[in-house]
Regions:
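S-adenosylmethionine
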Residues: 1-398
């Protein structure tokens, strides 16, 4: 499996696989379910396979076993069909895969009892590094709830683009259920493709709007969105500014800037200037960009608040990431702070729930960027707020 090599993200691999293979609608949905499911439940699957077969399997055999056990554990596919279809894809490992999966069917009750008695990380398929740090931070009950949340399919949530349409108009046109967390959000049964294509809405979690509302840009302001791609927050800032004033939207990746431009054009955003910028290695200066009334710094982070949507994140994180990332985040704050006008506002935000990237960075900013005055912060926690995990802190410049 290409994902296991660690060089590509799961979403990119899936997208390419779907382009390379002509699936029917049903087969496409099943392929996606198994692909994401095997990654999401990898630790649980390996635990069950270990109960059925002590001998270590090669990569191809292990993947076939994971796909088969996942179907037996998490889908409604008939037992015989799940076994037979998996065996047919196993090549030279057919005999081993057939034997292990048939044993699973025979011993399922005992296997489920063993799984129920297993530690949280095994039962809910999370690495020990995350389970341990969350247990220290939240306690075992909330950690269990967080792991359960991360394993649930993400709801389809859209933010209504008021530059083009009102919430009421969209609800009359095709339904959607209001979301209590935010008045511009609707929960959909399925992706509203025509609305997305015509820019009437943008798919995003309501927690992503928190930082923008804390920044509170006004029509006519000059705003810097320092790490802007793919544009969900940028477009919401423009919406709040009624397309008046100016937003300079930056990103380090040319590919991501392309997506940013496409999204802004589709959403009818006209007050944004898109620029490539590396805020760590070669930060643009005041001569190049000028000064800003408002700065949004949505910093690269561990993504531990969005594991439900980014299924491979849990397996990629290492302890050193929680040492490395805060240094980079603090570097970003210091490099953009000089572009803020006196009396201006800067919001630092992440989609992490880790204190090293959030409150501790805020405390560091008081020491390392004394020109910034901390005003307030807010965070969302999935197990408490029923939205993605996020953090935002507001600073002003004296």
């Amino acid at each position: 499996m290409r994902w296991e090599k660690g060089t590509e993200f799961a979403d990119a691999i899936l997208h390419r696989s779907l382009e390379e293979n002509r699936f029917s609608t049903l087969d496409r949905a099943l392929f996606m379910e198994i692909f994401y499911g095997v990654i999401r439940y990898g630790r649980t699957l390996d635990f069950l396979i270990g109960k059925l077969r002590e001998q270590e399997a090669d990569t191809r055999t292990r993947q076939a076993l994971r796909m088969g056990v996942y179907q037996l554990l998490r889908t409604r596919i008939p037992r015989h069909a799940a076994v037979n279809e998996t065996v047919n894809t196993a090549g030279r490992s057919r005999a081993v895969v057939n034997a292990v999966l048939r044993r699973y069917v025979r011993e399922e009750k005992e296997l489920m009892q063993s799984l129920e008695a297993a530690p949280v990380g095994v039962r809910l398929s999370h690495p020990e590094i995350l389970v341990s740090r969350w247990t220290r931070q939240f306690g075992i009950e909330d950690t269990t709830r967080l792991c359960e949340w991360n394993n649930e399919p993400a709801d389809i949530l859209i933010r209504v683009n008021e530059l083009k349409v009102s919430v009421g108009e969209l609800m009359k046109a095709g339904g959607g259920e209001p979301v209590a967390f935010h008045p511009l959000m609707l929960k959909m049964e399925k992706l509203p493709i025509p609305w997305i294509v015509t820019g009437l809405c943008y798919v995003q979690d309501p927690s992503t709007l928190m930082a923008c509302e804390m920044l509170a840009p006004r029509p006519g302001d000059r705003v810097l969105d320092a790490c802007a791609a793919p544009g969900g927050k940028t477009s919401y800032l423009a919406q709040g500014m009624k397309n008046e004033g100016r937003i300079v939207a930056c990103d380090v990746s040319a590919e991501r800037l392309g997506r940013l431009r496409e999204n802004l054009e589709r959403l009818g955003v006209t007050n944004v200037e898109v620029r490539k910028a590396d805020w760590l290695r070669a930060p643009p200066g005041q001569k190049e960009l000028g000064k800003f009334d408002r700065i949004l710094l949505d910093a690269p982070c561990s993504n531990t608040g969005v594991i439900r949507r980014r299924v491979d994140v849990r397996w990629r994180l290492k302890e050193e990431d929680f040492l490395r990332l805060p240094d980079a985040q603090m570097g970003l704050i210091k490099n953009v702070a000089g572009l803020l006008k006196p009396g201006g506002a800067l919001v630092y935000s992440t989609c992490s729930i880790e204190p090293e990237e959030n409150d501790e960075v805020v405390r560091r900013a008081a020491r390392e960027a004394p020109e910034l005055k901390f005003v307030k912060s807010r965070r969302t926690l999935p197990f408490r707020d029923k939205v993605d995990g996020a953090f935002a802190a507001l600073f002003t410049r004296a």
